Amino acid sequence: MSAELKQKLMFLGICLAAVSLLYGRTLAGDFVFDDRGIVEHQALLSNLNQLDKMLTLPYWTEEAGLYRPITLASYTFNYLLFGSGPAGFHFVNLLLHALTGFLIYLLVDKLFKRRLLAYLTALIFLLLPIHSEAVANIIGRAEILALLFSLLAFLSLLKEPQPNQGGLNLKNYWPAGVWLFLAIGSKETAIAALPIAAVMIYAKEKIFWSRENFYKYLPAAAWSAAGLAAYFGLRFLVLGGEYFLKSVTSMVENPLQFVSAGPRIITALNILALYFKKSFWPLGLCSDYSYNQLPVLHNFFNAGTLIGLAVLSLAVVGVFLVRRAPIISLAAAIFLFGFLPTANLFFPTGTIMGERLAYFPSLGFSLLLAYGLNEIFKFRGKIMAKYLAVGLFAALAVFYGAVSFLRAGDWLTEKRLFASAAGCAPLSVLSRSNLGASYYLAGDLVNAKKELLAAREIYDGYPKGINNLGLVYWKEGDLKTARELFLKALSFKFPYYGAYENLALISLEEGKVKEARLWLMLLYSGDKATADNYVEAYLNAE
Protein backbone atom coordinates (compact mmCIF):
# COMPACT_ATOMS: atom_id res chain seq x y z
CA MET A 1 0.00 0.00 0.00
CA SER A 2 1.44 3.35 -1.06
CA ALA A 3 1.97 6.20 1.39
CA GLU A 4 -0.55 8.28 -0.59
CA LEU A 5 -3.25 5.64 -0.24
CA LYS A 6 -2.50 5.21 3.47
CA GLN A 7 -2.85 8.95 3.99
CA LYS A 8 -6.21 9.00 2.19
CA LEU A 9 -7.54 6.03 4.14
CA MET A 10 -6.40 7.64 7.38
CA PHE A 11 -8.30 10.82 6.59
CA LEU A 12 -11.37 8.80 5.61
CA GLY A 13 -11.13 7.21 9.05
CA ILE A 14 -10.95 10.68 10.63
CA CYS A 15 -14.09 11.70 8.72
CA LEU A 16 -15.93 8.59 9.90
CA ALA A 17 -14.78 9.13 13.49
CA ALA A 18 -15.81 12.80 13.49
CA VAL A 19 -19.28 12.05 12.14
CA SER A 20 -19.72 9.16 14.59
CA LEU A 21 -18.77 11.40 17.49
CA LEU A 22 -21.11 14.20 16.45
CA TYR A 23 -24.10 12.20 15.24
CA GLY A 24 -23.64 8.66 16.57
CA ARG A 25 -26.41 9.19 19.10
CA THR A 26 -28.93 9.49 16.25
CA LEU A 27 -28.60 5.72 15.73
CA ALA A 28 -30.93 5.43 18.73
CA GLY A 29 -33.35 7.90 17.16
CA ASP A 30 -36.79 7.25 15.71
CA PHE A 31 -38.51 8.20 12.47
CA VAL A 32 -39.54 11.81 13.11
CA PHE A 33 -41.36 14.62 11.33
CA ASP A 34 -41.03 14.27 7.54
CA ASP A 35 -39.42 10.83 7.98
CA ARG A 36 -42.97 9.53 8.35
CA GLY A 37 -43.21 9.47 4.56
CA ILE A 38 -40.72 6.59 4.55
CA VAL A 39 -42.86 4.60 6.97
CA GLU A 40 -46.10 5.38 5.12
CA HIS A 41 -44.62 4.14 1.83
CA GLN A 42 -42.90 1.08 3.33
CA ALA A 43 -44.89 -1.40 1.22
CA LEU A 44 -43.50 0.19 -1.94
CA LEU A 45 -40.02 1.17 -0.77
CA SER A 46 -39.21 -2.18 0.84
CA ASN A 47 -39.99 -4.18 -2.31
CA LEU A 48 -37.05 -4.55 -4.69
CA ASN A 49 -39.45 -5.66 -7.43
CA GLN A 50 -40.98 -2.18 -7.29
CA LEU A 51 -37.65 -0.46 -8.01
CA ASP A 52 -38.57 0.22 -11.64
CA LYS A 53 -41.87 1.75 -10.50
CA MET A 54 -39.97 4.37 -8.50
CA LEU A 55 -38.67 5.84 -11.74
CA THR A 56 -42.27 6.74 -12.57
CA LEU A 57 -43.28 8.14 -9.19
CA PRO A 58 -43.13 11.74 -7.95
CA TYR A 59 -41.45 12.44 -4.64
CA TRP A 60 -44.47 11.79 -2.37
CA THR A 61 -47.01 13.99 -4.23
CA GLU A 62 -47.31 15.23 -7.80
CA GLU A 63 -48.36 18.74 -6.72
CA ALA A 64 -45.07 19.26 -4.90
CA GLY A 65 -43.34 19.30 -8.30
CA LEU A 66 -40.53 17.06 -7.04
CA TYR A 67 -38.97 14.07 -8.81
CA ARG A 68 -36.23 12.29 -6.84
CA PRO A 69 -36.02 8.63 -7.90
CA ILE A 70 -32.47 8.14 -6.64
CA THR A 71 -33.36 9.19 -3.10
CA LEU A 72 -36.38 6.87 -3.14
CA ALA A 73 -34.21 4.02 -4.46
CA SER A 74 -31.74 4.60 -1.62
CA TYR A 75 -34.54 3.92 0.87
CA THR A 76 -35.26 0.61 -0.88
CA PHE A 77 -31.65 -0.52 -0.52
CA ASN A 78 -31.79 0.65 3.10
CA TYR A 79 -34.74 -1.66 3.77
CA LEU A 80 -32.99 -4.56 2.03
CA LEU A 81 -29.65 -4.15 3.81
CA PHE A 82 -30.68 -3.03 7.30
CA GLY A 83 -34.38 -3.78 7.69
CA SER A 84 -37.25 -1.45 8.53
CA GLY A 85 -35.91 0.04 11.77
CA PRO A 86 -34.78 3.68 11.88
CA ALA A 87 -31.24 2.80 13.04
CA GLY A 88 -30.29 1.50 9.59
CA PHE A 89 -31.53 4.67 7.92
CA HIS A 90 -29.63 6.87 10.36
CA PHE A 91 -26.49 4.76 9.87
CA VAL A 92 -26.57 5.28 6.10
CA ASN A 93 -27.04 9.03 6.55
CA LEU A 94 -23.98 9.18 8.80
CA LEU A 95 -21.95 7.11 6.35
CA LEU A 96 -22.94 9.31 3.41
CA HIS A 97 -22.14 12.50 5.34
CA ALA A 98 -18.65 11.21 6.22
CA LEU A 99 -18.06 10.12 2.63
CA THR A 100 -19.12 13.58 1.42
CA GLY A 101 -16.50 15.15 3.68
CA PHE A 102 -13.85 12.80 2.28
CA LEU A 103 -14.82 13.65 -1.32
CA ILE A 104 -14.55 17.35 -0.47
CA TYR A 105 -10.99 16.72 0.66
CA LEU A 106 -10.18 14.86 -2.59
CA LEU A 107 -11.70 17.61 -4.74
CA VAL A 108 -10.00 20.58 -3.05
CA ASP A 109 -6.65 18.77 -2.97
CA LYS A 110 -6.90 17.78 -6.64
CA LEU A 111 -8.01 21.22 -7.79
CA PHE A 112 -5.68 23.47 -5.80
CA LYS A 113 -2.84 21.12 -4.73
CA ARG A 114 -3.05 22.47 -1.17
CA ARG A 115 -3.47 19.61 1.25
CA LEU A 116 -3.93 21.67 4.40
CA LEU A 117 -6.67 23.66 2.70
CA ALA A 118 -8.33 20.39 1.67
CA TYR A 119 -8.16 19.00 5.22
CA LEU A 120 -9.57 22.18 6.74
CA THR A 121 -12.40 22.51 4.21
CA ALA A 122 -13.55 18.93 4.72
CA LEU A 123 -13.38 19.06 8.52
CA ILE A 124 -15.14 22.42 8.79
CA PHE A 125 -17.87 21.11 6.50
CA LEU A 126 -18.39 18.00 8.63
CA LEU A 127 -18.48 20.08 11.81
CA LEU A 128 -20.96 22.77 10.71
CA PRO A 129 -24.01 22.54 13.01
CA ILE A 130 -26.37 23.83 10.32
CA HIS A 131 -25.97 20.37 8.76
CA SER A 132 -27.60 18.68 11.75
CA GLU A 133 -31.02 18.67 10.09
CA ALA A 134 -29.76 17.10 6.87
CA VAL A 135 -27.82 14.40 8.75
CA ALA A 136 -30.01 13.63 11.79
CA ASN A 137 -33.29 13.86 9.88
CA ILE A 138 -33.44 10.78 7.61
CA ILE A 139 -35.32 12.65 4.90
CA GLY A 140 -32.32 15.00 4.69
CA ARG A 141 -30.58 12.28 2.71
CA ALA A 142 -31.70 13.99 -0.50
CA GLU A 143 -29.43 16.93 0.36
CA ILE A 144 -26.47 14.68 1.13
CA LEU A 145 -26.83 12.58 -2.02
CA ALA A 146 -27.20 15.66 -4.23
CA LEU A 147 -23.87 17.05 -3.03
CA LEU A 148 -22.11 13.69 -2.87
CA PHE A 149 -22.91 12.81 -6.49
CA SER A 150 -22.08 16.38 -7.58
CA LEU A 151 -18.64 16.00 -6.00
CA LEU A 152 -18.14 12.74 -7.89
CA ALA A 153 -19.13 14.54 -11.10
CA PHE A 154 -16.57 17.28 -10.37
CA LEU A 155 -13.84 14.72 -9.69
CA SER A 156 -14.71 12.94 -12.92
CA LEU A 157 -14.51 16.25 -14.77
CA LEU A 158 -11.04 16.98 -13.39
CA LYS A 159 -9.54 13.72 -14.60
CA GLU A 160 -6.79 14.25 -17.12
CA PRO A 161 -7.98 13.43 -20.65
CA GLN A 162 -6.65 10.25 -22.18
CA PRO A 163 -5.84 10.44 -25.89
CA ASN A 164 -7.17 7.77 -28.19
CA GLN A 165 -5.43 7.49 -31.54
CA GLY A 166 -4.97 11.20 -31.88
CA GLY A 167 -8.39 12.09 -30.53
CA LEU A 168 -10.52 11.78 -27.41
CA ASN A 169 -12.52 8.66 -26.67
CA LEU A 170 -16.04 9.73 -25.78
CA LYS A 171 -16.57 6.51 -23.84
CA ASN A 172 -13.98 7.55 -21.24
CA TYR A 173 -16.20 10.36 -19.96
CA TRP A 174 -19.51 8.62 -19.30
CA PRO A 175 -19.12 8.89 -15.46
CA ALA A 176 -19.67 12.66 -15.63
CA GLY A 177 -23.15 12.17 -17.09
CA VAL A 178 -24.02 9.33 -14.72
CA TRP A 179 -22.96 11.24 -11.60
CA LEU A 180 -24.87 14.33 -12.72
CA PHE A 181 -28.01 12.28 -13.36
CA LEU A 182 -27.70 10.69 -9.93
CA ALA A 183 -27.14 14.09 -8.30
CA ILE A 184 -30.19 15.76 -9.83
CA GLY A 185 -32.17 12.56 -9.40
CA SER A 186 -31.44 12.85 -5.68
CA LYS A 187 -32.55 16.48 -5.48
CA GLU A 188 -33.22 19.13 -8.09
CA THR A 189 -30.90 21.66 -6.44
CA ALA A 190 -27.94 19.72 -7.85
CA ILE A 191 -28.53 21.68 -11.06
CA ALA A 192 -26.15 24.12 -9.34
CA ALA A 193 -23.35 21.72 -10.29
CA LEU A 194 -23.37 23.07 -13.87
CA PRO A 195 -22.31 26.70 -13.25
CA ILE A 196 -20.03 25.56 -10.41
CA ALA A 197 -18.29 23.18 -12.83
CA ALA A 198 -17.74 26.06 -15.26
CA VAL A 199 -16.05 28.14 -12.55
CA MET A 200 -14.03 25.11 -11.50
CA ILE A 201 -12.71 24.56 -15.02
CA TYR A 202 -11.78 28.22 -15.32
CA ALA A 203 -10.00 28.08 -11.95
CA LYS A 204 -8.05 25.03 -13.10
CA GLU A 205 -7.20 26.11 -16.65
CA LYS A 206 -6.65 29.84 -15.90
CA ILE A 207 -8.27 30.76 -19.21
CA PHE A 208 -11.90 31.36 -20.11
CA TRP A 209 -11.83 30.14 -23.66
CA SER A 210 -9.47 28.21 -25.90
CA ARG A 211 -9.90 25.70 -28.69
CA GLU A 212 -7.82 23.18 -26.72
CA ASN A 213 -10.03 23.43 -23.62
CA PHE A 214 -13.17 23.21 -25.73
CA TYR A 215 -12.18 19.82 -27.12
CA LYS A 216 -10.71 18.76 -23.80
CA TYR A 217 -14.00 19.11 -21.94
CA LEU A 218 -16.42 18.50 -24.82
CA PRO A 219 -16.83 14.75 -24.13
CA ALA A 220 -17.63 15.34 -20.46
CA ALA A 221 -20.05 18.12 -21.45
CA ALA A 222 -21.75 15.81 -23.94
CA TRP A 223 -22.25 13.09 -21.34
CA SER A 224 -23.47 15.68 -18.82
CA ALA A 225 -26.01 16.92 -21.36
CA ALA A 226 -27.16 13.33 -21.86
CA GLY A 227 -27.57 12.90 -18.10
CA LEU A 228 -29.61 16.10 -17.90
CA ALA A 229 -31.77 15.09 -20.86
CA ALA A 230 -32.48 11.71 -19.26
CA TYR A 231 -33.50 13.29 -15.95
CA PHE A 232 -35.67 16.04 -17.38
CA GLY A 233 -37.26 13.65 -19.86
CA LEU A 234 -38.29 11.33 -17.04
CA ARG A 235 -39.36 14.29 -14.93
CA PHE A 236 -41.72 15.49 -17.66
CA LEU A 237 -43.22 12.02 -18.09
CA VAL A 238 -43.82 11.68 -14.34
CA LEU A 239 -44.95 15.19 -13.40
CA GLY A 240 -46.49 16.29 -16.69
CA GLY A 241 -46.48 19.80 -18.05
CA GLU A 242 -48.38 21.31 -15.11
CA TYR A 243 -45.84 20.46 -12.41
CA PHE A 244 -42.69 20.07 -14.51
CA LEU A 245 -41.34 23.46 -13.41
CA LYS A 246 -43.80 24.36 -10.67
CA SER A 247 -44.26 23.49 -7.03
CA VAL A 248 -47.71 23.96 -5.53
CA THR A 249 -47.80 24.25 -1.77
CA SER A 250 -49.85 25.87 0.98
CA MET A 251 -49.50 29.10 2.92
CA VAL A 252 -48.11 27.07 5.83
CA GLU A 253 -45.04 25.79 3.96
CA ASN A 254 -44.26 28.91 1.95
CA PRO A 255 -46.26 32.14 2.20
CA LEU A 256 -43.95 33.63 -0.46
CA GLN A 257 -45.96 31.73 -3.08
CA PHE A 258 -48.89 34.00 -2.30
CA VAL A 259 -47.31 37.47 -2.56
CA SER A 260 -46.02 39.60 -5.41
CA ALA A 261 -42.38 39.64 -6.51
CA GLY A 262 -41.40 42.69 -4.43
CA PRO A 263 -42.23 41.37 -0.94
CA ARG A 264 -40.99 37.92 -1.95
CA ILE A 265 -37.54 39.21 -2.92
CA ILE A 266 -37.31 41.49 0.14
CA THR A 267 -38.14 38.56 2.43
CA ALA A 268 -35.87 36.14 0.54
CA LEU A 269 -32.89 38.46 0.99
CA ASN A 270 -33.61 38.62 4.71
CA ILE A 271 -33.69 34.82 4.80
CA LEU A 272 -30.38 34.66 2.90
CA ALA A 273 -28.85 36.73 5.69
CA LEU A 274 -30.29 34.26 8.22
CA TYR A 275 -28.70 31.33 6.38
CA PHE A 276 -25.32 33.05 6.35
CA LYS A 277 -25.55 33.99 10.02
CA LYS A 278 -26.61 30.51 11.14
CA SER A 279 -23.85 28.90 9.09
CA PHE A 280 -21.19 30.92 10.90
CA TRP A 281 -22.88 31.47 14.27
CA PRO A 282 -25.12 28.42 14.72
CA LEU A 283 -27.10 29.42 17.78
CA GLY A 284 -30.88 29.30 17.57
CA LEU A 285 -30.99 26.50 15.00
CA CYS A 286 -34.55 25.40 14.31
CA SER A 287 -36.34 22.64 12.42
CA ASP A 288 -39.25 24.82 11.35
CA TYR A 289 -39.73 28.24 9.79
CA SER A 290 -43.31 27.76 8.62
CA TYR A 291 -46.03 30.42 8.65
CA ASN A 292 -45.81 32.83 10.45
CA GLN A 293 -42.38 32.46 12.04
CA LEU A 294 -40.84 34.46 9.19
CA PRO A 295 -43.36 37.18 8.34
CA VAL A 296 -43.44 38.51 4.79
CA LEU A 297 -41.54 41.81 4.68
CA HIS A 298 -42.61 44.80 2.61
CA ASN A 299 -40.01 47.39 3.59
CA PHE A 300 -36.71 47.00 1.72
CA PHE A 301 -34.80 49.11 4.23
CA ASN A 302 -34.50 46.67 7.10
CA ALA A 303 -31.26 45.24 8.45
CA GLY A 304 -31.86 41.64 7.38
CA THR A 305 -32.70 42.48 3.78
CA LEU A 306 -29.77 44.87 3.42
CA ILE A 307 -27.37 42.30 4.89
CA GLY A 308 -28.79 39.66 2.55
CA LEU A 309 -28.29 41.98 -0.41
CA ALA A 310 -24.70 42.59 0.69
CA VAL A 311 -24.04 38.83 0.99
CA LEU A 312 -25.56 38.23 -2.44
CA SER A 313 -23.59 41.07 -4.01
CA LEU A 314 -20.31 39.91 -2.48
CA ALA A 315 -20.95 36.38 -3.73
CA VAL A 316 -21.57 37.65 -7.27
CA VAL A 317 -18.42 39.78 -7.17
CA GLY A 318 -16.49 36.86 -5.71
CA VAL A 319 -17.38 34.60 -8.62
CA PHE A 320 -15.74 37.06 -11.04
CA LEU A 321 -12.47 36.96 -9.10
CA VAL A 322 -11.72 33.59 -10.65
CA ARG A 323 -8.49 34.71 -12.32
CA ARG A 324 -7.04 36.65 -9.36
CA ALA A 325 -8.42 34.55 -6.49
CA PRO A 326 -9.67 31.17 -7.78
CA ILE A 327 -10.29 29.71 -4.32
CA ILE A 328 -12.46 32.66 -3.27
CA SER A 329 -14.20 32.53 -6.63
CA LEU A 330 -15.06 28.85 -6.31
CA ALA A 331 -16.24 29.32 -2.71
CA ALA A 332 -18.49 32.18 -3.83
CA ALA A 333 -19.80 30.14 -6.78
CA ILE A 334 -20.73 27.16 -4.60
CA PHE A 335 -22.45 29.41 -2.06
CA LEU A 336 -24.27 31.47 -4.70
CA PHE A 337 -25.36 28.78 -7.14
CA GLY A 338 -26.05 26.32 -4.33
CA PHE A 339 -28.58 28.70 -2.77
CA LEU A 340 -30.30 30.10 -5.85
CA PRO A 341 -32.51 27.06 -6.63
CA THR A 342 -34.19 27.28 -3.20
CA ALA A 343 -33.73 30.98 -2.42
CA ASN A 344 -37.22 32.19 -3.52
CA LEU A 345 -35.49 35.08 -5.31
CA PHE A 346 -36.34 34.34 -8.94
CA PHE A 347 -39.33 32.08 -8.31
CA PRO A 348 -41.17 30.78 -5.23
CA THR A 349 -40.27 27.28 -4.10
CA GLY A 350 -41.92 24.66 -1.91
CA THR A 351 -40.62 26.03 1.40
CA ILE A 352 -39.74 29.43 2.81
CA MET A 353 -36.63 28.23 4.69
CA GLY A 354 -35.05 25.04 5.95
CA GLU A 355 -31.61 24.52 7.44
CA ARG A 356 -31.19 21.31 5.44
CA LEU A 357 -31.20 23.52 2.32
CA ALA A 358 -27.86 24.99 3.44
CA TYR A 359 -26.09 21.63 3.02
CA PHE A 360 -24.90 22.16 -0.57
CA PRO A 361 -24.10 25.91 -0.46
CA SER A 362 -22.36 25.66 2.92
CA LEU A 363 -19.49 23.92 1.13
CA GLY A 364 -18.66 27.37 -0.25
CA PHE A 365 -18.74 28.81 3.26
CA SER A 366 -16.48 25.98 4.50
CA LEU A 367 -13.98 26.55 1.70
CA LEU A 368 -13.88 30.29 2.39
CA LEU A 369 -13.38 29.81 6.13
CA ALA A 370 -10.71 27.18 5.52
CA TYR A 371 -8.95 29.51 3.09
CA GLY A 372 -8.81 32.24 5.72
CA LEU A 373 -7.32 29.88 8.32
CA ASN A 374 -4.87 28.48 5.78
CA GLU A 375 -3.67 31.97 4.83
CA ILE A 376 -3.07 32.84 8.49
CA PHE A 377 -1.20 29.57 9.05
CA LYS A 378 1.21 30.04 6.14
CA PHE A 379 2.01 33.67 7.00
CA ARG A 380 5.77 33.78 6.47
CA GLY A 381 8.14 34.31 9.35
CA LYS A 382 5.36 34.58 11.94
CA ILE A 383 5.26 31.59 14.27
CA MET A 384 2.47 33.32 16.20
CA ALA A 385 0.35 33.26 13.05
CA LYS A 386 0.56 29.47 13.02
CA TYR A 387 -0.43 29.30 16.68
CA LEU A 388 -3.30 31.67 15.96
CA ALA A 389 -4.56 29.57 13.04
CA VAL A 390 -4.37 26.37 15.08
CA GLY A 391 -6.08 28.05 18.02
CA LEU A 392 -8.88 29.44 15.86
CA PHE A 393 -9.51 26.08 14.23
CA ALA A 394 -9.48 24.30 17.59
CA ALA A 395 -11.96 26.83 19.00
CA LEU A 396 -14.22 26.44 15.96
CA ALA A 397 -14.00 22.65 16.15
CA VAL A 398 -14.98 22.59 19.83
CA PHE A 399 -17.76 25.17 19.36
CA TYR A 400 -19.22 23.68 16.18
CA GLY A 401 -18.77 20.13 17.45
CA ALA A 402 -20.55 20.83 20.73
CA VAL A 403 -23.48 22.56 19.01
CA SER A 404 -23.79 19.74 16.44
CA PHE A 405 -23.74 17.09 19.17
CA LEU A 406 -26.40 18.85 21.24
CA ARG A 407 -28.54 19.65 18.22
CA ALA A 408 -28.49 16.01 17.08
CA GLY A 409 -30.26 15.13 20.33
CA ASP A 410 -33.29 17.18 19.32
CA TRP A 411 -33.94 14.74 16.46
CA LEU A 412 -34.07 11.58 18.60
CA THR A 413 -37.84 11.64 19.17
CA GLU A 414 -40.77 13.64 17.88
CA LYS A 415 -41.57 14.82 21.38
CA ARG A 416 -38.10 16.36 21.76
CA LEU A 417 -38.12 17.77 18.24
CA PHE A 418 -41.54 19.36 18.51
CA ALA A 419 -40.76 20.86 21.92
CA SER A 420 -37.55 22.30 20.48
CA ALA A 421 -39.36 23.65 17.42
CA ALA A 422 -42.08 25.32 19.48
CA GLY A 423 -39.35 26.99 21.53
CA CYS A 424 -37.38 28.33 18.57
CA ALA A 425 -40.41 28.98 16.34
CA PRO A 426 -43.23 30.05 18.66
CA LEU A 427 -45.01 31.89 15.83
CA SER A 428 -45.11 28.84 13.54
CA VAL A 429 -48.52 27.23 13.15
CA LEU A 430 -46.79 23.96 12.28
CA SER A 431 -44.55 23.88 15.37
CA ARG A 432 -47.34 24.73 17.80
CA SER A 433 -49.67 22.22 16.16
CA ASN A 434 -47.06 19.46 16.23
CA LEU A 435 -46.34 20.10 19.90
CA GLY A 436 -50.06 19.93 20.59
CA ALA A 437 -50.23 16.58 18.78
CA SER A 438 -47.36 15.20 20.88
CA TYR A 439 -49.18 16.27 24.06
CA TYR A 440 -52.34 14.59 22.77
CA LEU A 441 -50.51 11.31 22.14
CA ALA A 442 -49.09 11.49 25.67
CA GLY A 443 -52.62 11.88 27.07
CA ASP A 444 -52.08 15.49 28.20
CA LEU A 445 -55.30 16.99 26.84
CA VAL A 446 -54.93 20.30 28.68
CA ASN A 447 -51.61 21.22 27.09
CA ALA A 448 -52.63 19.66 23.78
CA LYS A 449 -55.67 21.92 23.58
CA LYS A 450 -53.63 24.95 24.65
CA GLU A 451 -51.04 24.44 21.88
CA LEU A 452 -53.57 23.56 19.18
CA LEU A 453 -55.67 26.63 19.98
CA ALA A 454 -52.49 28.74 19.86
CA ALA A 455 -51.73 27.25 16.44
CA ARG A 456 -55.21 28.15 15.25
CA GLU A 457 -54.72 31.71 16.46
CA ILE A 458 -51.63 31.96 14.25
CA TYR A 459 -53.39 30.56 11.17
CA ASP A 460 -56.82 28.98 10.92
CA GLY A 461 -55.94 27.20 7.69
CA TYR A 462 -53.70 24.28 8.64
CA PRO A 463 -55.84 21.17 8.03
CA LYS A 464 -53.86 18.69 10.13
CA GLY A 465 -53.77 21.06 13.10
CA ILE A 466 -57.53 21.59 12.87
CA ASN A 467 -58.03 17.83 12.70
CA ASN A 468 -55.86 17.35 15.79
CA LEU A 469 -57.88 19.93 17.68
CA GLY A 470 -60.96 17.95 16.70
CA LEU A 471 -59.40 14.87 18.29
CA VAL A 472 -59.03 16.76 21.57
CA TYR A 473 -62.70 17.82 21.56
CA TRP A 474 -63.67 14.24 20.72
CA LYS A 475 -61.73 12.98 23.74
CA GLU A 476 -63.48 15.60 25.87
CA GLY A 477 -66.84 14.27 24.67
CA ASP A 478 -67.77 17.27 22.51
CA LEU A 479 -68.66 15.30 19.38
CA LYS A 480 -70.44 18.23 17.71
CA THR A 481 -67.35 20.49 17.77
CA ALA A 482 -65.11 17.56 16.85
CA ARG A 483 -67.22 16.77 13.78
CA GLU A 484 -67.21 20.43 12.71
CA LEU A 485 -63.42 20.56 12.94
CA PHE A 486 -62.97 17.31 10.99
CA LEU A 487 -65.21 18.66 8.23
CA LYS A 488 -63.25 21.92 8.22
CA ALA A 489 -59.98 19.96 7.88
CA LEU A 490 -61.40 18.47 4.67
CA SER A 491 -62.50 21.79 3.19
CA PHE A 492 -59.10 23.15 2.11
CA LYS A 493 -57.23 22.92 -1.17
CA PHE A 494 -54.85 20.49 0.52
CA PRO A 495 -57.23 18.63 2.87
CA TYR A 496 -56.21 16.29 5.64
CA TYR A 497 -57.75 13.01 4.46
CA GLY A 498 -57.29 11.33 7.82
CA ALA A 499 -60.30 13.37 8.97
CA TYR A 500 -62.51 11.00 6.92
CA GLU A 501 -61.47 8.14 9.20
CA ASN A 502 -62.17 10.23 12.29
CA LEU A 503 -65.65 11.08 10.99
CA ALA A 504 -66.25 7.39 10.31
CA LEU A 505 -65.16 6.45 13.83
CA ILE A 506 -67.50 9.04 15.37
CA SER A 507 -70.33 7.61 13.26
CA LEU A 508 -69.50 4.07 14.40
CA GLU A 509 -69.33 5.27 18.00
CA GLU A 510 -72.85 6.64 17.56
CA GLY A 511 -74.06 3.42 15.90
CA LYS A 512 -74.44 5.02 12.46
CA VAL A 513 -72.85 2.19 10.45
CA LYS A 514 -74.22 3.27 7.06
CA GLU A 515 -72.87 6.80 7.53
CA ALA A 516 -69.49 5.42 8.62
CA ARG A 517 -69.28 3.37 5.41
CA LEU A 518 -69.86 6.52 3.35
CA TRP A 519 -66.98 8.33 5.07
CA LEU A 520 -64.73 5.32 4.58
CA MET A 521 -65.66 5.09 0.90
CA LEU A 522 -64.40 8.67 0.54
CA LEU A 523 -61.23 7.78 2.43
CA TYR A 524 -60.52 4.72 0.27
CA SER A 525 -61.45 6.34 -3.06
CA GLY A 526 -64.66 4.34 -3.50
CA ASP A 527 -63.20 0.96 -2.51
CA LYS A 528 -66.31 -0.63 -0.97
CA ALA A 529 -64.58 -3.87 0.03
CA THR A 530 -61.93 -2.07 2.07
CA ALA A 531 -64.57 0.12 3.71
CA ASP A 532 -66.68 -2.94 4.61
CA ASN A 533 -63.66 -4.76 6.03
CA TYR A 534 -62.84 -1.73 8.19
CA VAL A 535 -66.38 -1.58 9.59
CA GLU A 536 -66.47 -5.33 10.18
CA ALA A 537 -63.13 -5.22 12.03
CA TYR A 538 -64.39 -2.36 14.22
CA LEU A 539 -67.64 -4.12 15.09
CA ASN A 540 -65.88 -7.41 15.84
CA ALA A 541 -63.43 -5.63 18.16
CA GLU A 542 -66.21 -4.20 20.31
Residue spans for each PLM region:
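Boundary/linker segments of alpha-helical solenoid repeat arrays
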Residues: V429-L430, P463-K464, P495-A499, S525-A537
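TPR/TPR-like (Sel1-like) alpha-helical repeat modules
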Residues: E501, L505-T530
